[in-house]
Regions:
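Structured interaction patches on ligand/partner-binding surfaces of diverse proteins
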Residues: 69-71, 95-142, 240-268
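Bacterial N-terminal signal peptides that target proteins for export
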Residues: 1-4
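Secondary-structure boundary elements
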Residues: 134-140, 150-153, 160-169
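Conserved "repeat-terminator" motif of extracellular CCP/Sushi domains
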Residues: 145-152, 220-226
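Exposed, polar/acidic Ser/Thr-rich sequence context and nearby capping/turn residues
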Residues: 146, 159-163, 225-226, 235-284
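Bacterial Sec-dependent N-terminal signal peptides
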Residues: 10-40, 256, 280-297
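Tryptophan-paired
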Residues: 48-102, 167-255, 291-297
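Structural motif
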Residues: 34-46, 158-166
């Protein structure tokens, strides 16, 4: 028996493949392998894998499976008729994550949403990956490679020169209520933020002598769709109870992105517009250069 395995090396694109039919009557099928989009995620423990296969033409659910490991996923083969499909995989999608519209009677690829029951939970990362594939022969074996990326963004705030024992607390005001993994962004990647928004708390931190005031790394939903900036509200509180308020606008956060806000206490203004510097494929630094909140004003 001659088996042809077709490796789809680029996820999130229409899959164009060469293939041969088998020389017996046994049907072929589709297998799914998972890889990491961000090399930093190599070695991540995976103990929960959900897999959906949708008809890309009408949005209907074709298959839905739940596995305990990536090996279980790779060992399964799906017998699919000729057609156009989108394969969605999600890993570590456990509480406080939830799946919206997740009933087999109504589930449609355009309705499926990943959300957080508590927007401020900052849980360990869950991951998703999508492959778009066309099957034009039913007795050929295909294998897809889904590149898995973070559902959530990461945000860390650093403020240099904050006086000792000052407290910082705040909120991100327009994080999305969820991510729609099978809807496309303008750049063609899968995974758009919802248009509905909510707030995410920035936990209390106290300035320690000799150290930069730094938040924990927050894991949060990306900026809600329809907004051109991420909106933050921060308060610095002196030991005597004097409160200074700061309204901040920054670039949009995307799913899987890592964002670092770097500020100087002496340069902070009540209204600040932050600009971005790219550090690597996933990470941006946001700083204040003295612009007014809306540069067009």
């Amino acid at each position: 028996m001659v088996w042809l395995w077709v490796l789809l090396c680029v996820p999130c694109l229409w899959a164009s493949c060469d293939h041969d039919v088998h020389n017996d009557e046994e049907e072929g099928g589709l297998s799914v392998s998972l890889t990491w989009a961000d090399e930093a995620d190599q070695g991540t423990d995976v103990n929960d894998v959900k897999l959906w296969i949708f008809n890309a033409d009408d949005g209907s659910l074709v298959e839905e499976k739940h596995h305990g490991s990536t090996q279980e996923v790779a060992s399964q083969r799906f017998a699919l008729p000729v057609g156009h499909y989108q394969i969605l995989a999600a890993t570590n999608l456990i509480e406080p994550f939830f799946i919206g519209e997740a009933t087999r009677a109504t589930l449609n690829m355009n309705q499926l949403m990943f959300g957080l029951s508590n927007p401020s939970a900052s849980p360990d990362h869950a991951y998703y990956g999508v492959t778009d594939i066309g099957i034009d022969k039913s007795n050929v074996n295909y294998i897809t490679k889904n590149e898995m990326r973070h559902i959530l963004a990461e945000l860390t705030i650093f403020i240099e020169g904050v006086p000792d024992n000052f407290a910082m607390i705040g909120k991100v005001l327009n994080v999305a209520t969820g991510l729609l993994p099978l809807q496309k962004n303008e750049d063609g990647t899968f995974g758009t933020a919802s248009y509905t928004k909510e707030e995410c708390d920035i936990p209390l931190r106290i300035a320690v002598p000799g150290e930069t005031l730094k938040t924990e790394t927050l894991r949060l939903m990306p900026t809600a769709n329809g907004f051109h900036t991420t909106k933050l509200f921060i308060q610095l509180i002196s030991p005597g109870g004097v409160v200074s308020n700061y309204d901040i606008e920054a670039p949009v956060m995307k799913s899987g992105g890592k964002y670092k806000i770097n500020l100087e206490f002496e340069e902070m203004k009540p209204y600040m517009y932050l600009t971005s510097t790219k550090i690597d494929d996933w990470t941006e630094e946001w700083i204040y250069r003295g612009e007014i909140l809306n540069p067009e004003d």
